[in-house]
Amino acid sequence: MEGIQHPIPRTVEEVFSDFRGRRAGLIKALSTDVQKFYHQCDPEKENLCLYGLPNETWEVNLPVEEVPPELPEPALGINFARDGMQEKDWISLVAVHSDSWLISVAFYFGARFGFGKNERKRLFQMINDLPTIFEVVTGNAKQSKDQSANHNSSRSKSSGGKPRHSESHTKASKMSPPPRKEDESGDEDEDDEQGAVCGACGDNYGGDEFWICCDACEKWFHGKCVKITPAKAEHIKHYKCPSCTTSKKMKA
């Protein structure tokens, strides 16, 4: 297990950086690397845990033998429930436990290094500005407070799915940034676009980045997160993200 091989964060900024790194690794495990993660969680093995590491990687491993452990431990035995649930529900369950673990690690560091009321509040606000892992992997990522109400309302009132266009138009829109609503003002369009969240890493939309939309789950992804370039996307008629591709294979 990881022990304390990484630098120990001591300031609010360092603890938040540690949090973001671990979070990115966990999101990767439950989205772009989900097939690899699924196969590593063999129910025939002993109690396994999913660890997110500060360097944005992840690992499935046995819990540490040290008692009490140096850091709070993630949920034990996630592999035992794998075959007794729908894959989607199992991934969601692991995501919820992973969110809880991230918070416990962050505030463990806060307690260890004597964070006061204001420091704890600032740390929580920084963490709370990011979507939870559960929100990212289930496609329910929340935007910032001033955008969430209008943005989520407009999405829930949509007609349930993208309109069907010609194949050439579909291919073009697939590589475009998250779509704007034509009947909204320019400012609202900008807010809606900025509020879009990558289904893999959970980060918000950036105007200078290439994005692609999954035709199955209709989530948007950074091209770099799903290893798709603009040139490659030109030749894809119907794109499916790693999670949807894996789900289809599991059901086959």
Swiss-Prot record:
Residues 184-193 have a biased composition (Acidic residues). The modification Phosphoserine is found at S176. One of its GO terms (biological process) is chromatin organization. It holds the Pfam family PHD. PROSITE patterns: ZF_PHD_1, ZF_PHD_2. The PHD-type zinc finger mediates the binding to H3K4me3. Interacts with H3K4me3 and to a lesser extent with H3K4me2. This is PHD finger protein ALFIN-LIKE 7.
